Amino acid sequence: MGHLPRGTLGGRRLLPLLGLFVLLKIVTTFHVAVQDDNNIVVSLEASDIVSPASVYVVRVAGESKNYFFEFEEFNSTLPPPVVFKATYHGLYYIITLVVVNGNVVTKPSRSITVLTKPLPVTSVSIYDYKPSPETGVLFEIHYPEKYNVFSRVNISYWEGRDFRTMLYKDFFKGKTVFNHWLPGLCYSNITFQLVSEATFNKSTLVEYSGVSHEPKQHRTAPYPPRNISVRFVNLNKNNWEEPSGSFPEDSFIKPPQDSIGRDRRFHFPEETPETPPSNVSSGSPPSNVSSAWPDPNSTDYESTSQPFWWDSASAAPENEEDFVSALPADYDTETTLDRTEKPTADPFSAFPVQMTLSWLPPKPPTAFDGFNILIEREENFTDYLTVDEEAHEFVAELKEPGKYKLSVTTFSSSGACETRKSQSAKSLSFYISPTGEWIEELTEKPQHVSVHVLSSTTALMSWTSSQENYNSTIVSVVSLTCQKQKESQRLEKQYCTQVNSSKPVIENLVPGAQYQVVMYLRKGPLIGPPSDPVTFAIVPTGIKDLMLYPLGPTAVVLSWTRPILGVFRKYVVEMFYFNPTTMTSEWTTYYEIAATVSLTASVRIASLLPAWYYNFRVTMVTWGDPELSCCDSSTISFITAPVAPEITSVEYFNSLLYISWTYGDATTDLSHSRMLHWMVVAEGRKKIKKSVTRNVMTAILSLPPGDIYNLSVTACTERGSNTSLPRLVKLEPAPPKSLFAVNKTQTSVTLLWVEEGVADFFEVFCQQLGSGHNGKLQEPVAVSSHVVTISSLLPATAYNCSVTSFSHDTPSVPTFIAVSTMVTEVNPNVVVISVLAILSTLLIGLLLVTLVILRKKHLQMARECGAGTFVNFASLEREGKLPYSWRRSVFALLTLLPSCLWTDYLLAFYINPWSKNGLKKRKLTNPVQLDDFDSYIKDMAKDSDYKFSLQFEELKLIGLDIPHFAADLPLNRCKNRYTNILPYDFSRVRLVSMNEEEGADYINANYIPGYNSPQEYIATQGPLPETRNDFWKMVLQQKSHIIVMLTQCNEKRRVKCDHYWPFTEEPIAYGDITVEMVSEEEEEDWASRHFRINYADEAQDVMHFNYTAWPDHGVPPANAAESILQFVFTVRQQAAKSKGPMIIHCSAGVGRTGTFIALDRLLQHIRDHEFVDILGLVSEMRSYRMSMVQTEEQYIFIHQCVQLMWLRKKQQFCISDVIYENVSKS
């Protein structure tokens, strides 16, 4: 006997078994048996032997693999059997015998199928089937699961005297339910066997496991009795005799001798009353009493619950003493009982009361052996009686008043099982008054109970009921939130324990608390069942006095107070902001704070983004389920302060200070922050401020040299700022400029110079020329003015004089001048006249020779003078005006300088070389027919635009004598961007202001006449940070709906205009005016924005057109003429739809502004006329605001645009159809 796996039999002639079933010869038989220990025994019979030389092999199949066994070699006797230890119990195996004779394998003689026996059930549990314990049971069996196979379970038991058995397969996890047993019957000797089944060759094998568990027994519950009813009869006490019976003499119930008095029967309200038997007399029962005796064949049955009035805990589940079982002291029997008799002198004269209890047998086919009767009175006395199965009535006498409870149950006791009672039928509860009257049980609970919250402290209950035999209600209220709070932190006291009231209004509630209310109906001392509990909550009132205290750029402290009356679980602190990571704005919870008894609370919120807009909200969340919170209106908004910038570099050259700084780190987001701009401040003897847009972190300041400046950069938001650490910069003093020697005499000379920057004093030193070391040295003279007279000089002597500026004890580089004193004998007047004559002759000759050669250079110098080269020599006067002789000498010198300089010098000294009374207001004109315009342009452009230059020089003389006193007021000087671009008084725009101070109505702006109106335009400078509020005030007061901006805020590292509008769509207040950017559209060369400005209850829409491709002091490129004309036409189309003057500005409000106005007027003029007068147009504009069309280049550009307008008009006959159509930008 041995176990031979496949693939190991080649040496023993078993290799052919694996695949060589070639030759079929002999058919044999063999024997297979299965033992109890799960061994399969295979033995050979004598008839199986073919030849002793043959090999006999057994194949076992059934498990996951096949097993092969070879019989031992034998001669005369049969070999011992082959034994296979089966792994599985309850599994079928196929046994095959194979004979190998040489290399020939016979066909298997036959295959025998055997089935092993499954392992038995080890334990059994039997339970009631809770939905139906009368007919149903739950079986739970336990058995070995590993290697145990079965298909069904055989259940055997004795049903009374009958034996039952059945095969059952609906077991799930070892459990199944029987729901067809008989009620009240004893089932015994219950056993379970596992059954294995197999089908092979149309034959079925079945094996049963043994029974190893203890046999079980179980009795089903009997059904309860039906149609229980009770009758009451008041007995005449004088006629009553002591009957014989089993009741004690002092019992509170006694069996009656006869029935005298009124007969009353009480039924379950849900059951149908039965017809009384003929031998029972009935009185006149009330409406809920039936005279019918129950039908013995009735099968009506209803399972009911225990009464609610008897156990006071049902009315007061948390406090059993809340409801008193005894009759209340103020109980009035005349008003509370349905039927009442006047009490006699003896309150117990109506006793004893005879009670007759009747019932019907339980629903068939219930097996039962009798009935149990339970009589209770006020939990003090209990009688438990048993009657046999034939009894259907029980009579007793009640000797005392009180609350009674009756119940009748069925019991079953026959058989070997334990005695079992039925579930209790609905108990009968009633009250017997001292007068013998009875009150039936209240069985209905209040329906549709609801609570309506009237206020934060009161609520009103409502309900419905079909019963009308109750006279009051009980409202039981308990707080569900009180017990959730720690006693030390408890915020409510009133309803922490159950409180009962007879009023429907619930008072003294606390906001934020959650309550549960139960209602009972009450009649006399009887209390009905409780209603379904109703839960309601009072919304919290929310916090108040929410305050915010900033702690720097990234942290704030929120503090608030809670209402005195209120209960809640926690505070929830939320914040709303734009998240630059997710690019979304949403409310997020930052922190939760547990509720405390403290009236105040605070929280520190950190890790905020600097210069960011936040909304904070604090809500109170209740304990209830679901949670309630209040209130979303408890919010506060705040813009965090920016972080302090850090100045990284400061460089000074060419009289300009270059400052650079950094802000935050690489992750700092400026594009979505509330950063408005930077304020760069240089504070020395003069404080200089400059506003820089937030996207630029460099600034250029023109600082007077010679001073020590405290530099700082301030990051500004709408509500706060943060300043960098200061940086001290000391600028070396500059040498005096324009040093002149005037009013020379034989022994003295007067030196005159211009101060450059800041100087504490000047040191003047004169040394005689050619004296060598023996010359007399003059002592240095320290002066604080710009004029000094050096005396004690030698006549007719040459001196080298120097003037050095001193500032903060630091000297500048000296400025030198060579002077000579007058000769004693010579008349000074003759010398002066001679010198002037020689100088005049030389000057005239020089001008004639170099006029053509230096023309371009002269014009370039004029342009380089710019707006910032004006020097007011009037400041040189310290004590009155300069002497006339000085002024003449200065004039003679200044005529050598370019006209842009000396005209300002002359005006500064009030010197007019052309006229004693000055130039009057002039009107120039030069009309040109458009048909001749091309040839006119060619003629004007000859010799490097020489004739254009002559015309433009004449334009410079316009308006020199027009006053601008308002602009020169000290209060208004800071409102001017450039000191030499000032508005004329007669045409300036005056602001309406409640402030009557001088200069309150001033803004650097002038009315300019147009093609349609004498005040069609307002030309103004680009707003300064100090004047942006006045700018918006002008827009609102002038009812302007169009603003044209012809500059960028920063050009060539210089600030040209303040960013006077909001960066984002968030409204910003400029003084009393709020500006909101509704929309913004970007084109290739310009941007258009829609603003809405609000003041009080007034709103005004404004369109803002910003042309960004126009260089300062210049003109757009030649190929951009189409673009600028398209822009002008776009603005004109919008202007046609609105009223009020158009506001036009660039930086100074004269160059690009004048060019735009000229093009807009000419565009309208050419549409209706065949000539133009550009010279007259510019002359007229300059008579309303100085320097309109500021450069000659701009003046020529206007002519080029007119040439293009006329060309398009000639080509298309309608200029607007072609040149101004909206073309897409590539």
UniProtKB/Swiss-Prot annotation:
The modification Phosphoserine is found at residue 875. Its main location: membrane. GO terms for cellular component: apical plasma membrane; dendritic spine; GABA-ergic synapse; glutamatergic synapse; lateral plasma membrane; plasma membrane; postsynaptic density membrane. InterPro entries: FN3_dom, FN3_sf, Ig-like_fold, Prot-tyrosine_phosphatase-like, PTP_cat, PTPRO, Tyr_Pase_AS, Tyr_Pase_cat. Disruption phenotype: Modification of podocyte structure such that the normal octopoid podocyte is simplified to a more amoeboid structure and that the foot processes are shorter and broader than normal. These changes are associated with altered distribution of the podocyte intermediate cytoskeletal protein vimentin/VIM. Mutant animals have a reduced glomerular filtration rate and reduced glomerular nephrin (NPHS1) content. However, there is no evidence of proteinuria. After removal of one or more kidneys, Ptpro-null animals have higher blood pressure than does their wild-type littermates. Keywords: Glycoprotein, Hydrolase, Membrane, Phosphoprotein, Protein phosphatase, Receptor, Repeat, Signal, Transmembrane, Transmembrane helix. Residues 948-1205 form the Tyrosine-protein phosphatase domain. It is a single-pass type I membrane protein. Disulfide bonds: none annotated. PROSITE patterns: FN3, TYR_PHOSPHATASE_1, TYR_PHOSPHATASE_2, TYR_PHOSPHATASE_PTP. Pfam families: fn3, Y_phosphatase. Residues 30-115, 339-435, 445-541, 542-638, 641-734, 735-827 form the Fibronectin type-III domain. It is an enzyme of class 3 (hydrolase). GO terms for biological process: axon guidance; cell morphogenesis; glomerulus development; lamellipodium assembly; monocyte chemotaxis; negative regulation of canonical Wnt signaling pathway; negative regulation of glomerular filtration; peptidyl-tyrosine dephosphorylation involved in inactivation of protein kinase activity. The modification Phosphotyrosine is found at residue 1220. The chain crosses the membrane at residues 833-853. It catalyses: O-phospho-L-tyrosyl-[protein] + H2O = L-tyrosyl-[protein] + phosphate. Interacts (phosphorylated form) with FYN and GRB2. Possesses tyrosine phosphatase activity. Plays a role in regulating the glomerular pressure/filtration rate relationship through an effect on podocyte structure and function. This is Receptor-type tyrosine-protein phosphatase O. It comes from Mus musculus. The gene is Ptpro.
